[in-house]
Amino acid sequence: ATCAGQDKPCKETCDCCGERGECVCGLSYEGKYRCICRQGTFLIAWYKLASCKK
């Protein structure tokens, strides 16, 4: 999946602020699709991921 405004497609797996999860495209509060982290049905907000230092 590729999110609008993203240079790269969402990865299948990623480090979600230290928690393992699946990166998926999701609708943010801005009304834009962003890469977000999903762990089962639990979503970690994209802005929290963006604030994580890689």
UniProtKB/Swiss-Prot annotation:
Tissue: Expressed by the venom gland.
Family per record: Belongs to the neurotoxin 03 (Tx2) family. 04 subfamily.
Protein name, UniProt field: U7-ctenitoxin-Pk1a
Molecular function terms, GO-annotated: sodium channel regulator activity; toxin activity
Main location: secreted
InterPro entries: CNTX (IPR035285)
Disulfide bonding pattern of the chain: 3-17, 10-23, 14-52, 16-37, 25-35
One cellular-component annotation, GO: extracellular region
Cellular compartments annotated: Secreted
Taxonomic lineage: Eukaryota, Metazoa, Ecdysozoa, Arthropoda, Chelicerata
Domain of life: Eukaryota
Pfam families: D_CNTX
Species in which this protein is naturally found: Phoneutria keyserlingi (Brazilian wandering spider)
Function: Blocks voltage-gated sodium channels (Nav). Causes immediate spastic paralysis and death in mice within 1 minute of injection at dose levels of 1.5 ug per mouse.
Domain remark in the UniProt entry: The presence of a 'disulfide through disulfide knot' structurally defines this protein as a knottin.
Claim: Lipid biosynthesis is one of the keywords in the record: no
Keywords (A to Z) from UniProt: Disulfide bond, Ion channel impairing toxin, Knottin, Neurotoxin, Secreted, Toxin, Voltage-gated sodium channel impairing toxin
